[in-house]
């Protein structure tokens, strides 16, 4: 038997360019519509689990209704908290720009002021992932979540170094993207990742 995990990143948000971690900003109408375009690929899903942040939860509720599935939320699927710079438009950041630049160059070495460390974020997400794959709860699970969460899961599945800046600088997880991970249920199975 194979287990499918569809990782959906929320659509584009209603806000200026910024690091939106724990800031609970709404998804834009166009972003929601773009995410909803995946609903046919999700047919046959057995459950939907969403980040509790409204940019994910709004679309997850609509998907759950369309697919006639129960929706649950998991705080562990929330984006990394970016501390004092969370939700601040980039155009408004002046004095703290060097801190932001250092974070972008090496996020595992430079935690933003008041932020969740990358190590804590990684441990939170990977802990959730390990629990959910140990008890799949059906053969097709949809996770509506955030770009950072998806990167952490991909790094775990592929055995990549989650501290490497390349994971954050070179792996693009677009808004409203669908990443499908298939795990076969036998000891020597190799996970397969598809970007749809």
Describe the role of every protein-language-model region.
Residues 5, 137-148:
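Generic beta-sheet signal
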Residues 42-44, 132-139:
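Glycine-rich phosphate-binding loop signature in dinucleotide/nucleotide-binding domains
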Residues 65-127:
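Phosphate-handling substructures
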Residues 4, 8-69:
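Active-site-proximal alpha-helix that buttresses catalytic centers in soluble enzyme cores
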Residues 147-151, 177:
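GST superfamily/GST-like fold recognition
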Residues 50-51, 123, 144-145:
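Short beta-strand scaffold positions
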Residues 1-4, 80-92, 137, 155-196:
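Acidic, low-complexity terminal tails and accessory targeting/binding regions
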